[in-house]
């Protein structure tokens, strides 16, 4: 939810849009009034942003953070068995385990746990919708514009959702990579949005 990003400073004269509910994909807004538009996509949002905008880029910068355009893939994303296991075990206890892995350490987990949780049914609908759209995609038939879309990738070396090795496998040779010592949820390691798009 947008609460997760509340601590990040927004530069002056900057509008911030946060897209986070992926039960249906679509973005009807226009970027036309803006001189600069910086995209930061996190986790499965990297796949969503690629899907929505890879063919018609209108961004000053595009940063992929702890995700790839192939989010369910044994060597380039979340291993298929883990993705499916997460989907099939969405419950309060299952989400608690997932959140622990996502947060990586107790301090991050405690801070994240203070936020209002999204309704479990909403999370399940979202993950099922994404799974059904991701499942038929094949690496061989990928749109070649995907590789040129992203300006940089930031990957967390302690990511327990998207293995760092898989993130490296995908991003190596496609764009500059910045590695940070952080869990899958890296936002508490930053103070400002412009740290993510510089």
Give, region by region, the residue ranges found by the protein language model.
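Conserved HGGG/HGGXW glycine-rich cap/lid loop of the alpha/beta-hydrolase fold
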Residues: 1-26
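Gly/Ala-rich beta-loop-alpha elbow adjacent to hydrolase catalytic centers
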Residues: 40-49
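Flexible "cap/lid" loop of the alpha/beta hydrolase fold
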Residues: 55-89, 126-131, 190
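Helix-rich cap/lid subdomain of alpha/beta-hydrolase
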Residues: 71-114
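Hydrophobic, aromatic-rich cap/lid helix
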Residues: 111-140
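Short beta-strand/loop motif that positions the catalytic acidic residue
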Residues: 147-148, 153-155, 159
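Catalytic histidine-centered segment of alpha/beta-hydrolase-like enzymes
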Residues: 161, 178-197
């Amino acid at each position: 939810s947008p609460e997760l990003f509340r601590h990040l400073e927004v530069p002056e004269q900057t509008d911030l849009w946060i897209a986070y509910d992926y039960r249906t994909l679509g973005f009807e807004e226009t970027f036309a009034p803006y001189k600069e538009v910086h995209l930061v996509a996190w986790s499965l949002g990297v796949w969503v942003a690629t899907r929505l905008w890879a063919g018609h880029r209108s961004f000053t910068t595009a940063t992929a953070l702890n995700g790839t355009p192939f989010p369910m893939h044994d060597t380039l994303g979340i291993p298929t068995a883990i993705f499916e296991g997460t989907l099939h075990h969405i419950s309060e206890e299952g989400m608690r385990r997932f959140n622990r892995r996502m947060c990586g350490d107790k301090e991050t987990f405690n801070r994240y746990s203070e936020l209002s949780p999204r309704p479990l049914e909403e999370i399940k609908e979202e993950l099922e919708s994404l799974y059904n759209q991701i499942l038929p995609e094949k690496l061989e038939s990928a749109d070649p514009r995907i590789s040129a879309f992203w300006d940089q990738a930031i990957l967390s070396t302690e990511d327990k959702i998207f293995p760092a090795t898989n993130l490296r496998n995908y991003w190596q040779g496609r764009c500059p990579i910045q590695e940070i010592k952080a869990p899958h949820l890296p936002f508490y390691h930053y103070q400002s949005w412009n740290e993510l798009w510089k």
